[in-house]
């Protein structure tokens, strides 16, 4: 049984990315769907779709690579806020990942969004992960 669905999702993406798999299957939750939507908008994955099997919902993420040598788009993906140690930031202290080259995914009162969008709206929240 998985206690941290976000860490499980990020680990599955990281492992599939390391061996250059095209598709990775992730248990579907509202949070994982919101994170997948952000990854698609920011260009880290090609696409994602949901399907249901035996009343369990799953996400299929299509990972993205570039060039003939299939260079990875996602260089690093790491969990920041964990169940044992939550990390919060207000709008003034939102993290800048790799001087703006990467993104931080933030869970706010207005939903899950990137650090750039949260800063433009002037809201803070829980820092879920960094991706670059």
UniProtKB/Swiss-Prot annotation:
InterPro entries for this protein: Ribosomal_uS8, Ribosomal_uS8_CS, Ribosomal_uS8_sf
What subcellular locations does the record give? Answer: Plastid, Chloroplast
Question: Does this UniProt record's set of keywords contain S-adenosyl-L-methionine?
Answer: no
Gene3D superfamilies (UniProt xref): 3.30.1370.30, 3.30.1490.10
Pfam family membership, one: Ribosomal_S8
Q: Which GO terms describe its cellular component?
A: chloroplast; ribonucleoprotein complex; ribosome
Q: What GO MF terms are annotated? A: rRNA binding; structural constituent of ribosome
Q: Which GO terms describe its biological process?
A: translation
**Which UniProt key words apply to this protein?**
Chloroplast, Plastid, Ribonucleoprotein, Ribosomal protein, RNA-binding, rRNA-binding
Q: What assembly does the database describe for this protein?
A: Part of the 30S ribosomal subunit.
Please describe what this protein does.
One of the primary rRNA binding proteins, it binds directly to 16S rRNA central domain where it helps coordinate assembly of the platform of the 30S subunit.
| Protein family (similarity comment) | Belongs to the universal ribosomal protein uS8 family.
Protein name per Swiss-Prot or TrEMBL? Small ribosomal subunit protein uS8c
- Gene symbol here is rps8
């Amino acid at each position: 049984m998985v206690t941290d669905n976000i860490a499980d999702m990020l680990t599955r993406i990281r492992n599939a990315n390391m061996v250059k798999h095209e598709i990775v299957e992730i248990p579907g939750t509202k949070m994982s769907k919101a994170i997948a939507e952000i990854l698609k908008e920011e260009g880290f994955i090609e696409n994602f779709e949901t399907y249901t099997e035996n009343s369990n919902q799953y996400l299929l993420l299509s990972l993205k690579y570039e060039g003939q040598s299939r260079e990875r788009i996602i260089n690093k993906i790491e969990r920041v806020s964990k169940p044992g140690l939550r990390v919060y930031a207000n709008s003034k202290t939102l993290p800048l990942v790799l001087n703006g080259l990467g993104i931080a995914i933030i869970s706010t009162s207005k939903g899950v969004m990137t650090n750039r969008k949260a800063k433009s709206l002037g809201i803070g929240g829980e820092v879920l992960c960094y991706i670059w």
